[in-house]
Amino acid sequence: MDLSLLKALSEADAIASSEQEVRQILLEEADRLQKEVRFDGLGSVLIRLNESTGPKVMICAHMDEVGFMVRSISREGAIDVLPVGNVRMAARQLQSVRITTREECKIPGLLDGDRQGNDVSAMRVDIGARSCDEVMQAGIRPGDRVTFDTTFQVLPHQRVMGKAFDDRLGCYLLVTLLRELHDAELPAEVWLVASSSEEVGLRGGQTATRAVSPDVAIVLDTACWAKNFDYGAANHRQIGNGPMLVLSDKSLIAPPKLTAWIETVAAEIGVPLQADMFSNGGTDGGAVHLTGTGVPTVVMGPATRHGHCAASIADCRDILQMQQLLSALIQRLTRETVVQLTDFR
C-alpha cells in the first residue's frame, strides 16, 4: 500500500470549491500516465482510464473535506469562522487548525467556540493576534479556508490515522485504480471522477455525471458508527471487517440486481463485505443516480472511526480489499452484464 500517497491526500487542505491541493495530486498521476482529463464547471476532475466501445462506467469519489471558512475579523483579532459541511460539534472546540490564505500561506491557530448544551456556536480561530491589523498583516482575509491541522500517522496492526479520510480514501482508490489498470484491456469505458463540493450538497457528483453520462456508477465514500467500540450485530461499519456495501441511505436505495452482482463477485475473489444502511445522511450517489434518465448506482467504501472531525482511523486491509474488489468489478462489467443489470422486464 502506498502510504506516502495516502499521507499526501490526507494532509492536503480542500474544503468545498477550494480543492486544488487534492486536484493537483490527481492531475500529476493522470499526466504521468498520459490520460485524458476533463473538468466540469465546478472543478471536478474527470479522468478517462481507457477507450472502449463497451458500456460507460463511472467510479466517483469526492475531493472536499469538512472544515471552515473565515467570515470576519474582530477589532480584537478574533477570526470568526463558519462551518463548511457538517463538522461534528465535539470537533468545534479547542482544535488545532490551519488557515490557507489567498497566497497559499499556511497560518496555524486554535479553533474555539461557545458551547450551549450540545451546540457549539460563535466559532473563532485564535492565531495569537491582538488586533484586526495583526490578522490582516498575516495575510488572512474573509473567505480564506480553514482545515484541521492533523498529521497523518501509521498505527499498529495495519491501521492509519489522519484527517479528511472522508473522502481521501476514495481519492486514494481512484489513483490506485489508475495505476493498476492504465494499460489494461477492459470491457467498459471507465471514467475515474473526483467530484467537487460533496460535503455541502452533493454538487459535483451531479455535474460530473452529466458530463460523463455513465451507464453504471460506483460511488466511493466512508462512514463510521456512532459508538466506535460497539461490535454488535447492527454495526456494519467496523474497521477491519471488509468494505461497506451501502444498500440504502437517505438519498439512494441501491438497485438489488447491482448489489447482488457485487456480492457475487466479492464472494468469488474472497473479499468480505459489510452490508450497511445509512439512517441519516447521503453521498454523491444521491445526485448521481438521478442524473439524466437515471443511472444504476451503488455506494461502497472502507469503514472508518471518528468521521467529520480532526482525525479518523481506518484499516489498510479494508482499503486494499476495496481496491481488489473495484478492479474485479471493472474487469467484469461487460455489455451483457450491464444489460442484465438494467433489464426491468
Predicted regions and their residues:
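N-terminal hydrophobic/helix-forming segments and targeting peptides
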Residues: 1-345
